[in-house]
C-alpha cells in the first residue's frame, strides 16, 4: 500500500440520482407464464410492505393485481394441531448412531430425522381490481412509467377521435396510510368517462368468495372477502375494498353486488384500495395455541383503514406517501454515466439490446437496476409487514414456484444484502420480527425434538406459520445452518448503525439462541481425530453427501461465535458461563478453511480422495459464504490481504463457472459470483458476471428470471444485483477481535472503467459513518466527503484500490 496521502474531501452539486424511471410505450399484459407477455415480465411492481400491486392491461380495462403479505394457504388454517413440521415426540435418539456412522465412513444417511412438507402451504394472490373506462377502446400516445424518485406508477394516453381527451392515471401504495391509491385525471376540462370498478379472482372456488357494493351519498365502496378453505378447520379469512373518495362529486351506482359504477365525474377520481387477512404473526407460539389467528374480522379492519385514508383526500395521501418514500430512497444514490441517452428509452428496449459481449455494458441501465432493487425492497419489506419472500410481495398465482416462501440457504439472505449500506436498515425490522415471532418459538421445539439441543434452529424452507423442521430430502432439507447465516444480518445491522438499544432488546437474544444451539450440537471430530469441533451431520446446500465438517457450516458458526463475543462490549452479558463456553468452543472450532489438491477452497472436510471436492459448476457458492457476503475468511482469517487465500478463492470461482450450468441458469448465482470477484478487487470479472446476469436473466420490466429469461421470477437476483454493485463500490469488513487496531475501508475496489467519472452519495460504513465519493475515468476513487462520522470506537482509514489514503477518521 502506498503511503502518500492525497485527495481531500470534495463536495460538488450532483444531479438527482432518483430521477430514473422504468418506461414503456405499451401496457403491461397478463399473458401466460411461458410467453413474453407474462405479467411478471411486463408489469412494474409497487407496494407498501403489506400490500403489493402490479398494474396491467390497456387503458379501457386497467387492472391492479393485488397481493397481501400474509395471504397463504396451509398451516393451522388448513389442518388442526399444525406442528410446523415437528414430530409429536423426540427423535434425537437416532443422532448418536447417525454421527457414529458418518465419522466411521465419512458419509452416511440421516433418514430418521427427515420430515415432510405436509400442509406447508403457499403464498397466493388475492385477486384483480378492474377499473373499466367507457368509450376508451381506442387510444394513442400511451406512456407508462414507474418513477423511482417517488414510487408512483403513472400512465397517460389520449382517447382516439377526442384530441382534447387526454387522461392520466397514477397508482401508489402508501406505507403511512396502509392503502394503495388509484387516481384518474383528465388533462382538460372534459368530464371523465364513465368508470366501473370490480374485484374478482377467477382462480379460486367462487363459493368461497363474497362481494358486496355500497353506494350512498357519504360512501361508495366495493367489498370483496373470502376464505382459503371451507374447513374444518376454517381457512384464512381475507378481505379487500375499493372505495371512492368524495362520492358526492359524482353519481355512483351499484351494478349488482359485484361492480360499482361512477359517472358524471368532473376532472378527477380517486379510489382507495385496502386488503387484510386474519393472520397474526404474534400468535405463533404455545401461549396462543400456535393459531396465528387474529380474532378480529379482516373485513372490518380493512374497511376502517380505507375509510380513514379516504378522508385525507388524494393530495394529502400522495404527499404523505412521497415524504415517506423519499426518506428511505433519497438518502443514497449512485451516479453512472448515460452516454447513449438511455434515460429517454423504453426499459424493455434497453434490456433487449443489452449484450454481454459489449465490454462497456450500459451504465445507465445498471444504475437503473440498482435503483429498482432499492424500490422493490422498500415496497416489499416494512416494519409492520412480513419480510420480502422469494417473489418479494408479488404473485399472480395460487401456487407460485417454491410457494414463494422463505428459502434460507442464500435467497432470503440475498434479499437484504443491499439494506444496511444504502440506508434501508428500516426494511429489516420485518425480518427481525418475523424471526423472533415465528422462527424462535417453533425452532426451540425443533432444536429439542430433533437434536436434544438448547437454543433454536430452522432449516432451508420456512413458511409464515413457523415451519422450522426438515422436509423430505437431506440433500436440500438438512440445513440447520440457516439461522446461523441469518445472524450475519443481525450483527451487520448493529455494526452499521451501532443501535445498542436494538441489540439489547432484540438482536442479541437472536444471536445468543443460535450460539446456544451450536454449543450443544457441535461434535469433536472423530474422523481426523484432530480435536476440532465440527457439525455432524451436515449437507452443503443442495449438493454433495451427508457428512461432517461442511465448510459452509463451519464458517457461519465461526461468525456467530465471533460476533457474540464482540457484542459483549455493548451487552455486558450476566451469563458468564455462556460467554466462556463460546470462547472455549471458538478456540477448538474448525473454521472451514481448507485447500483442495487443485488449489481451490474445499467444500467438505473429507479428504479429496473421496471425490467430492472436484471442479464443480454447481450454482451455489456455499463454501465461499465466509468470503462474501460473510467475513469468516475475508476478515477473521485475514483472507482479503492474504495472497494464498485470494488465489484459492479465485481458483474456486474459476472452477465454479459463470453460474449457467445444467443444474440452473439463475440470476442469483451470477450476481453472487460478481460480488465474490469484486471482493478480490477484480473489476473485470465482477463486471463480466454482472453484465452476464443482465443479458441472461433480466427481462423487459427489469425483473430477473430463474431459467435464463424464463420463469419463475425470483426477486433475490434483483436484490443481489444491488449487493454486487455495492461490493464493487466498497470493501468494508468488520474488525477481527484479534486485530482491534485501525480498520481499513477500500473505496472502489472493483469499479470498471465503463463507470468512469461516476460517484456515490450516502454510502453507509460500519460504525455508523456515511460518505460521498467519486472516481476518475479509470474507476479509481479520487475524492471522498465524510458526511457523518461513525459511533464505533475503532479508527478508520479510507483508501482507494491503488492504496492511496483518501481520509482517516
From Swiss-Prot:
Coiled coil: none
Keyword Mitochondrion carried by entry: no
Cellular component aspect of the GO annotation: extracellular region
Molecular function, one GO term: alpha-L-fucosidase activity
One GO process term, biological-process aspect: polysaccharide catabolic process
This protein's record includes keyword Hydrolase: yes
Record EC number: 3.2.1.51
Record: glycosylation sites: 81, 105, 128, 161, 205, 452, 614, 642, 681
Secretion signal, residue range per the UniProt entry: 1-19
Location(s), subcellular: Secreted
Top-rank taxon, per record: Eukaryota
A Pfam family recorded for this sequence: Glyco_hyd_65N_2
Keyword terms, alphabetized: Carbohydrate metabolism, Glycoprotein, Glycosidase, Hydrolase, Polysaccharide degradation, Secreted, Signal
Reactions catalysed: an alpha-L-fucoside + H2O = L-fucose + an alcohol
InterPro entries: 6-hairpin_glycosidase_sf, 6hp_glycosidase-like_sf, AFCA-like_C, Alpha-L-fucosidase, GH95_cat, GH95_N_dom
Role description: Alpha-fucosidase involved in degradation of fucosylated xyloglucans. Hydrolyzes alpha-1,2-linked fucose. Active on cotton xyloglucan oligomers but not active on paranitrophenyl-fucoside.
Family, similarity comment: Belongs to the glycosyl hydrolase 95 family.
PANTHER family per UniProt: ALPHA-FUCOSIDASE A, ALPHA-L-FUCOSIDASE 2
Name listed for the protein in its UniProt record: Alpha-fucosidase A
